[in-house]
C-alpha cells in the first residue's frame, strides 16, 4: 500500500512540475510581450526573446529535477520515441503542459486586462493583442513556409536538448540545464523567431489560444489561416522533434537506449 501511494505521489509531482513549468514559461514570455507592446515606451523584439528565454529557464529550473523538464509536448513525445520515456505517462504530461499554458495565459491576461482595453480602444479583442499570447504568422508566409519554420526550429531545439542530456557528450547537470536552454532560446528567437513567433511548443500555443477563445477573442483564433493552430504550432513541432531525434541518434549519439541500433 505504501509503495502504491508513493508511486502515485511521484506521478502527481511529475505532472505538477510540468504544469508549473509551462505556466512559468507563458507568464514570463507572454508577460514580456504584453509589456513590450502595450507600454507607452515599446521595446524591441529582442526583449520578447529574452522574456521567452527566461520563461524556459525558470520552467526548467522548477521541473528538470522532478519531471525531466520537458515542458513541451513535442519534447515529451520525442523522448518517448528515442529515450524510453514511458508512453503511459505521455498523456498526463501533455494534459498538464496544455493546462499550464492555459493558466499562465489567464494570469497574464488578468494582469494586463486594462492595458489591453486601452490598446484595443475598448472592450474589443483583435489579433493585435491575441498575438501577445499565441502565435500568428506574418502575412507573406505561405502555409508550407509556416510549417517549415516551426519544423526547423523544433528540430534544432530537440537536437540541442538531447545533447545537453547526453552523458556520452558532456551532459550538463540539472542545475546548468536551464542556463543552457536560456541561451538556446535567445538564439532560436534571434535566428528563427520572426516569421511565426517560434512556438516550437504545442502547449505554449494551444493552452493560451484556448484561453483566448474563452476570453472574448472567439473562434477567430482557431479559424485563422484554415486552422493554422493545428499544422504550424502543433504538428510541425511534433514532427520537427522527431526529425531532430532521428538526426542526432543516427549521427552523434552513442548510447544504448536509442531505438536506432544499427551503428
UniProtKB/Swiss-Prot annotation:
Its recorded name reads Aquaporin Lacbi1:247946
Q: Can you tell me where the transmembrane regions are?
A: 19-39, 46-66, 90-110, 144-164, 170-190, 228-248
What does its record list under induction? Expression is highest at 15 degrees Celsius and decreases at any other temperature.
Function in brief: Water channel required to facilitate the transport of water across membranes. Shows low but significant water conductivity, but no glycerol nor ammonium transport activities.
**Extracellular side: which ranges?**
40-45, 111-143, 191-227
Organism taxonomic ancestry:
Eukaryota, Fungi, Dikarya, Basidiomycota, Agaricomycotina
Question: What's the superkingdom here?
Answer: Eukaryota
Short motif NPA 1, span? 72-74
Matches recorded under CDD domains: MIP
Chief site of localization: membrane
Subcellular location per the Swiss-Prot or TrEMBL entry:
Membrane
Q: Molecular function (GO) terms listed?
A: glycerol channel activity; water channel activity
Q: What ranges does the Cytoplasmic topological domain annotation cover? A: 1-18, 67-89, 165-169, 249-263
Organism name: Laccaria bicolor (strain S238N-H82 / ATCC MYA-4686)
